[in-house]
């Protein structure tokens, strides 16, 4: 299973729509 950090990195390297989800995830983390 992926760690949160690995998932975070992968999402940021993916094209949309994953990018949109990553943005949401980022905002929650900040």
Curated annotation (Swiss-Prot):
Coiled-coil residue windows: none
UniProt EC number: 4.6.1.18
Localization: Secreted
Disordered: annotated span: 1-21
Active site (record annotation): 12 (proton acceptor)
GO cellular component: extracellular region
Record's keyword annotation contains NAD: no
Catalytic activity annotation: an [RNA] containing cytidine + H2O = an [RNA]-3'-cytidine-3'-phosphate + a 5'-hydroxy-ribonucleotide-3'-[RNA]; an [RNA] containing uridine + H2O = an [RNA]-3'-uridine-3'-phosphate + a 5'-hydroxy-ribonucleotide-3'-[RNA]
Tissues where this protein is expressed: Pancreas.
Annotated GO MF terms: lyase activity; ribonuclease A activity
Keywords for this protein: Endonuclease, Hydrolase, Lyase, Nuclease, Secreted
Binding of substrate, residues: 7, 10
Compositional bias ranges of the Basic and acidic residues kind: 1-13
Quaternary assembly: Monomer. Interacts with and forms tight 1:1 complexes with RNH1. Dimerization of two such complexes may occur. Interaction with RNH1 inhibits this protein.
Family that this chain belongs to: Belongs to the pancreatic ribonuclease family.
Record function comment: Endonuclease that catalyzes the cleavage of RNA on the 3' side of pyrimidine nucleotides. Acts on single-stranded and double-stranded RNA.
Protein name per UniProt: Ribonuclease pancreatic
Species name: Odocoileus virginianus virginianus (Virginia white-tailed deer)
